Amino acid sequence: MLDAIAAGTRQVVNLGAGYDDRALRFRHSGVQFFDLDLPEIIADKARRLEALDTDITRVTLAAVNFATDDVADVLARAGHDAQQPTLFIGEHLVLFLQPGDVKRLLAGVSSHAAKGSTLALTAEVHPAGLDSALIISTVDDVMFGGAGPLHTIKARDAWLNQFKQHGWQVNNANEVTAVNHFGLPMTDQPVQIQAQFLTATTVCLG
């Protein structure tokens, strides 16, 4: 984030921000932050910030349901300038969204991504050659007893292709930056699921 701001980015959109306080910790003159999350979370966050008498002049709290809302519309109503470069952050978000919702999210973000924008996303990745639906089903059964909240885990190439389809080029695509998230008991040996950190820049408007 600090590198993006130092490079001239003047808008930061935190997708699924929750109670993240980076908009306050890293505030800079001339930089507008947009924190997006579910309506109940945004309402509670606003109440807490007001109770603390926190200056949120440069912070816009915007309610969104990623399963039903168009992120592009939410950003437009919040005052985001689609003609100016933006840093979009999505940490530990897409794992909890259905694949169709992830696609719609990326499309909405891309439509508001001016040239020079950056997308920093945490994506859950399984080894190549495995069936993503089977992975999700196994996660659901083994970890959550059939009531799992995790919905989108893909092979790295699938993530790279999806980024490309929406006008994003992953930086240093051959270099993997990741942490091991959890293992699954499948076939002859456990399958390791990673949380990979993907940073991409716009190659065209979405």
Residue ranges and their predicted role:
Residues 1-206:
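Alpha-helical subdomain
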